[in-house]
C-alpha cells in the first residue's frame, strides 16, 4: 500500500483562512488533514509573550482553538478528496453516543472521508473545567465498544458498562457507504492502549516516538490483534510528529533550542526521560498529559523547567533537517510499518522569520515522499 502523507489542518480563526488552507493543501496533494480537539494549549500563557514569539502580537494567548467537528464539517463541504480526522478527540468531554452521531454526520458531509481519531484524553482539557478525569483508558475502551455498537445497529440497543448504561438507545443513521462506518484510529502510546488498539481499532496515530519505539508499539498492536483473531489487512498505521525544516541542518539545531519548541518536551511523562537516563523537570512522578495543566505554571517556573530539558531529548524526538533529511526520516518510519505519515511544521515557533520558507520546504518534503513511492 503506498504511503500516505497528511498535514495539520488550520484550527484558529479567521475561519475563511481555515477553509482556504484546507483547499490549498488538498490541491498540493496531501492525503489527509488533521485537527486537534483542545480547549487548552500545551504552552502556558505565561511564556506566550512577544519577547519569546512574535505570534503573541496578533494572537494574545495560545489557547485559541476552533471546534474540530464544526471545522471538519466546513472543510468537508469545500474539499473533494482529502481525508479529515481528529488528532485526537476523547470520550471524556464527548459522550460516545455524541461521537457516534457527530462522526456519522461528518461521514455524510464528507461522503465517506472522515476518520475518528480517539484517545484517552488529557488533564488540561478536562480537570480545570470541572470534568472528572479518571480511569481514562477503561473509559476509552468502553467508548469504542459503544460507538461500534451504535454504528452496527439501527434498532434500539441496551448496554451495561462501567461508565455508561444505555436502555433502548437508538442511532438510526447509517454510514454514507452502507456497512462502512468511519474508521477509528487511536492515539495510543502505552502498552494497554496499544493492546486495545489491536483488538478494536482501525488505525493508529501516535506521536513523539522514535523509530525503534514505533516499531515496538506497532508490534504490541499486531500481537494483540492476532490474539483477538483480527485481520489487520485494512488497519492503517499512522505517525505524526512535529518537524523542523530548513536549508541547513545545523541551523535547525539552533531552532530546536527555542523556548516554545523545548516546551513540547514537558508533555512527556517522567518515564520517557528515565529510559534515557534523564530527569523530568517536574519530577520522577510526573505523568505527562495525565498531570500537565499549563495554565497552572507561572513564567519563572516554566522557563526554569525548559532550561532543564536536555537538548539530546528534543534532538532525538523531533524530526529536523533539510527536506531530503525529513524524507529519509519518513522512510525510516515507513520501513518499520508506518503507512500514513503526518509531519507538523512548527519551525516558525522557533524562528518566525522562517514561516514562509518552512512551508515551501514542507511542499518539497511532500513531493519527495510521494515521488519515492
Predicted regions and their residues:
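Glycine-rich, proline-tolerant flexible connector loops at the mouths of alpha/beta enzymes
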Residues: 34-66, 90, 122, 127, ...
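N-terminal beta1-alpha1-beta2 module of alpha/beta enzyme domains
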Residues: 1-78, 181-182
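Short, acidic/polar
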Residues: 14-25, 99-102, 188-196, 256, ...
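An alpha-helical appendage that flanks or caps ligand/catalytic pockets
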Residues: 136-175, 212-335
Amino acid at each position: 500500500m503506498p504511503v500516505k502523507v497528511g498535514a495539520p489542518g488550520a484550527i484558529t480563526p479567521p475561519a475563511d483562512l481555515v477553509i482556504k488552507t484546507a483547499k490549498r493543501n488538498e490541491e498540493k496533494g496531501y492525503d489527509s488533514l488533521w485537527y486537534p480537539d483542545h480547549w487548552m494549549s500545551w504552552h502556558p500563557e505565561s511564556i506566550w509573550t512577544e519577547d519569546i514569539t512574535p505570534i503573541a502580537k496578533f494572537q494574545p494567548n495560545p489557547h485559541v482553538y476552533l471546534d474540530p467537528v464544526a471545522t471538519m464539517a466546513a472543510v468537508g463541504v469545500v474539499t473533494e478528496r482529502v481525508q479529515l480526522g481528529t488528532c485526537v478527540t476523547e470520550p471524556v468531554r464527548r459522550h460516545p453516543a455524541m461521537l457516534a452521531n457527530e462522526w456519522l454526520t461528518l461521514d455524510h458531509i464528507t461522503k465517506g472521508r472522515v476518520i475518528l481519531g480517539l484517545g484517552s484524553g488529557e488533564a488540561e482539557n478536562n480537570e480545570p473545567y470541572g470534568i472528572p478525569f479518571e480511569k481514562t483508558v477503561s473509559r476509552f475502551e468502553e467508548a469504542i465498544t459503544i460507538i461500534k455498537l451504535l454504528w452496527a445497529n439501527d434498532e434500539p440497543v441496551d448496554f451495561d458498562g462501567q461508565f455508561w448504561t444505555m436502555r433502548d438507545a437508538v442511532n438510526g443513521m447509517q454510514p454514507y457507504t452502507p456497512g462502512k462506518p468511519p474508521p477509528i484510529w487511536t492515539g495510543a502510546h502505552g502498552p494497554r492502549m496499544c493492546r486495545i488498539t489491536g483488538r478494536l481499532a482501525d488505525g493508529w496515530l501516535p506521536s513523539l516516538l522514535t523509530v525503534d519505539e514505533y516499531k515496538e508499539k506497532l508490534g504490541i498492536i499486531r500481537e494483540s490483534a492476532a490474539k483477538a483473531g483480527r485481520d489487520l489487512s485494512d488497519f492503517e498505521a499512522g505517525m505524526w510528529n512535529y518537524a523542523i525544516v530548513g536549508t541547513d541542518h545545523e541551523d535547525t539545531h539552533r531552532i530546536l533550542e527555542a523556548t516554545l519548541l523545548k516546551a513540547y518536551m514537558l508533555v512527556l511523562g517522567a518515564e520517557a526521560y528515565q529510559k534515557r537516563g534523564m530527569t523530568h523537570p517536574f519530577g520522577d512522578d510526573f505523568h505527562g498529559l495525565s498531570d500537565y495543566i499549563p495554565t497552572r505554571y507561572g513564567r519563572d517556573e516554566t522557563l526554569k523547567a525548559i532550561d532543564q530539558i536536555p537538548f539530546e531529548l528534543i534532538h532525538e524526538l523531533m524530526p529536523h533537517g533539510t527536506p531530503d533529511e525529513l524524507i529519509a526520516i519518513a522512510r525510516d518510519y515507513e520501513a518499520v510499518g508506518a503507512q500514513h505519515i503526518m509531519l507538523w511544521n512548527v519551525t516558525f515557533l522557533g524562528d518566525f522569520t522562517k514561516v514562509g520558507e518552512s512551508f515551501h520546504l514542507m511542499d518539497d518534503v511532500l513531493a519527495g515522499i510521494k515521488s519515492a513511492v
